[in-house]
A protein has these predicted regions:
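Short, solvent-exposed loop/edge-beta patches enriched in aromatic
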Residues: 46-51, 79-84, 101-105
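Short coil/turn motifs at secondary-structure junctions
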Residues: 60-62, 82, 115
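Conserved acetyl-CoA-binding loop-helix of GNAT-fold acetyltransferases
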Residues: 76-79, 84-100
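Short amphipathic alpha-helix that is part of the acyltransferase structural core
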Residues: 1-59, 66-73, 140-163
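Active-site/acyl-donor-binding loops of N-acyltransferases
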Residues: 59, 122-142
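Hydrophobic, well-ordered secondary-structure scaffolds
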Residues: 72-73, 92-98, 104, 110-115
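Conserved active-site alpha-helix within GNAT-family acetyltransferase domains
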Residues: 102-106, 112-130
């Protein structure tokens, strides 16, 4: 068994593991592996030429305390069913977080299905997402106060304050 970054010749194996573990649409999987997937930032547990587990460390830049910081967004945490319960993910997560530090990143981020799985590794909930669904016609009762215009470069400072 070996824990390491993937090679480009293993892209299909990583993709197969993703489609096995997640219910994403084919369009999404195609988009992800064409536009986001980076074998140099994807760690795997491999045994006998077979990929058993994977963690993708997608690179992002975030603004924190007025500073732009590079970070790894942990996604695609996955293990084949027959390899679960053997400690592979614990080893892979520990090695991945070591690599985050080796990249001079102070922290990693993720949006887990169940945050309890990641507390062991030092992750904590920093915010919740509130989703409200409403019918667009319910917005009729709100009156427009002001006007709209297409944003330009001159509006950048104002937009930064809003977002």
């Amino acid at each position: 068994m070996e824990i390491r970054f993937t090679n480009t010749n293993e892209n299909q194996g990583v993709r197969d593991l993703w489609t096995y573990c997640f219910t994403d649409s084919q369009d999404y999987v195609d988009f992800y592996f064409k536009n986001k997937y980076n074998p140099e930032k994807t760690m795997v547990v491999e045994d006998g030429g077979r990929i058993l587990s994977a963690i993708h460390l997608n690179q992002h830049r975030v603004k924190l305390g007025g500073k732009d910081l590079d970070t790894s967004y942990v996604v695609g945490v996955s293990t084949l069913a027959e390899a679960r319960g053997m400690g592979f993910m614990a080893d892979l997560m520990s090695r991945s977080l070591y690599q985050v530090g080796a990249m001079d990143q102070s922290f990693a981020i993720l949006m887990p299905i169940d945050h309890r799985l990641y507390r062991t590794y030092g992750f904590e909930t920093c915010y919740d997402i509130l989703e409200i669904k409403l019918d667009i016609f319910d917005l009729k009762k709100f009156k427009l106060d002001g006007s709209f215009k297409r944003a330009s470069k001159e509006d950048a400072d104002d937009l930064v304050e809003v977002y």
